[in-house]
Swiss-Prot record:
Name of the featured protein: Uncharacterized protein YtzC
Source organism: Bacillus subtilis (strain 168)
Taxonomy, superkingdom: Bacteria
Coiled coil (UniProt feature): 36-82
Keywords: Coiled coil
InterPro entries according to UniProt: Uncharacterised_YtzC
Length: 90
């Protein structure tokens, strides 16, 4: 079973990835293509965070799963926004 500490650490890492990605999305909307590398890095961090949550999900209890589920929804929503709103999309 996942420990409370491991869940909290993963949730903290997810929030850091979320905050970084959100910042890159804001920058991209202002600067267009000038931060492509950082934007891609932010997308990768979000994907890595979602994958880590999915792995942790397997060894978590019901209460932890609820926390992980809510975080995964937030991360995936931001992923979708980054894909749909990227200024270079044609």
């Amino acid at each position: 079973m996942a420990t409370r500490q491991s869940v909290d650490e993963h949730l903290q890492q997810c929030m850091q990835a979320y905050d970084y990605a959100e910042e890159q999305l804001k920058i991209a909307s202002k600067q267009e293509h000038y931060n492509d590398q950082e934007y891609s890095d932010a997308q990768m961090q979000l994907e890595d965070a979602v994958n880590a949550l999915n792995k942790l999900w397997l060894s978590s209890n019901d209460q932890q799963r609820e926390q992980l589920y809510r975080m995964r929804l937030q991360l995936q929503s931001l992923q979708n926004n980054m894909i749909l709103q990227h200024p270079l999309d044609v």
